Amino acid sequence: MSAKPNYETMYILRPDIAEEEVESHANKYRDLVVEAGGEVIDSQMRGKRRLAYNIGKHREGIYIQLNYSGDGKQVGPLEKAMRLSEDVIRYLTVKYEGQHSSLGRSTAPANPMASNTPRTEGQEQAKTEPQTAPA
């Protein structure tokens, strides 16, 4: 039996919500993962940070990172709940092929897509044909 893959969901909450609401959201999303058959590995409050660009009218956001393992069925309900929440302004889920350590670092390759990136026919042709300068 193979090990379940690991997932990391980073989500950003509105900066103007109360500390109790932040904890409530974090607990709700952890519970959703467990209810869907996943196992929460780690949940970290990254704090309020300035966004790289405005999201809606928000210039800051409260970052929370959720690491969990599962068979993939946890991602859909989790992201649906985040999408429907007015307090979540952005979220992203990443699947890790390697095992996650307790420190939140993956033992997977630094760039897992580098060797697995499919090329289109035009990209392969451009690599194999020599480039000549126009006359």
UniProtKB/Swiss-Prot annotation:
Residues 99-120 have a biased composition (Polar residues). The keyword Ribonucleoprotein applies. Transmembrane segments: none annotated. GO terms for biological process: translation. Residues 99-135 are annotated as: Disordered. One of its GO terms (cellular component) is ribonucleoprotein complex. GO terms for molecular function: small ribosomal subunit rRNA binding; structural constituent of ribosome. Keywords: Ribonucleoprotein, Ribosomal protein, RNA-binding, rRNA-binding. Gene3D superfamilies: 3.30.70.60. InterPro entries: Ribosomal_bS6 (IPR000529), Ribosomal_bS6_sf (IPR035980), Ribosomal_S6_plastid/chlpt (IPR020814), Transl_elong_EF1B/ribsomal_bS6 (IPR014717). Belongs to the bacterial ribosomal protein bS6 family. Binds together with bS18 to 16S ribosomal RNA. This is Small ribosomal subunit protein bS6. It comes from Synechococcus sp. (strain RCC307).
